[in-house]
Amino acid sequence: MEAFSDSFRTDLSQLMRWRRDVRRFRSDPVDEALLMQCLDTFRLAPSVGLSEPWRIVRVKSPELRQKSIENYQTANATALDGYDGEKAAMYSGLKLSGMSEAPEHIAIFCDDSTTKGSDLGATTMPEMRRYSVVGAINLMWLHARSHGLGMGWVSILDAPKLCTDLDI
């Protein structure tokens, strides 16, 4: 396997350093062709047994976007209740989501029950499907960042409720 140039490695290293969780988004629409390029990076991602367990949902309707935001707000309030004193003050001061400002909402799920790949590599380590999804998200994130797009990772959610709200 041939090595990449020093210049490429420097640029890649810089891209990885600048891949950060964004909480403050521009509100102008994301170019549709560019968004599709970002989503297409999932096709390049490795996955256990070629299972491609990721399931991607664009949350476009204002009603579903609002439900997602409210889901976050409820889960965030519950999380805040778990802190006292200084930790509660610090937590409440964090900007943990930019969902209201973000021009796109994309929900990404792992299909743990996929039959694609015939369980190759997942029989003994089923968590590899989830690792595959995380790896694919990282590729999308790097691609988006290389085009000047920011992404944010929202994990403060009631996932079962989100699945119900999105009819997953």
Residue ranges, per PLM feature:
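Specificity-determining recognition surfaces
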Residues: 1-36, 52
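Short glycine-enriched loop/turn motifs at secondary-structure junctions
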Residues: 19-21, 49-53, 101, 145-147
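A structural motif
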Residues: 35-43
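Small-aliphatic-rich amphipathic alpha-helix that forms the alpha element of a beta-alpha
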Residues: 42, 106, 121-165
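Glycine-rich phosphate/pyrophosphate-binding beta-alpha loops
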Residues: 43-49
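Glycine/small-residue-rich phosphate/adenosyl-binding loop
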Residues: 52-133
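A generic local secondary-structure boundary/capping motif
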Residues: 94-97, 164-168
